[in-house]
């Protein structure tokens, strides 16, 4: 069954149209994308390795995330994507919204959650994720953009507004104005 995405305008208003994943977005339209930063209580961040068969960034390390399917909110998509890619089940109320960012073709919503899950208990998604690691947050920040470690918004350079939010979340802040 093909994956459908809802389309939005630049102001995030629904256009009441869908597009099939893989099709070119019509000019001036956007879809919803999500990223989920998972921290453990030691402050390490969970990274997953993209499968070698992925067309974009094969073998790179990233935080879990993906695209909202038609009819999903970004919060629902974040819960689904985290479960699909790692086997970590979260309820919407567990996710803390960190920020919204406008990317080329996507409205990206970033969330964070704290979960102590041993790597041996993760259920990686075949064809999408091949490995996982807990990395100290500072070490990850130092490696972001090195060609092997991706930023959450899929830019090669660190995303300036996001990193302070991740650090604040890691340090205990839980209230953000989006």
Enumerate the predicted regions with their spans.
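A glycine-rich, hydrophobic loop/mini-helix early in the fold
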Residues: 33-65
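The catalytic Nudix box helix
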Residues: 46-47, 63-96
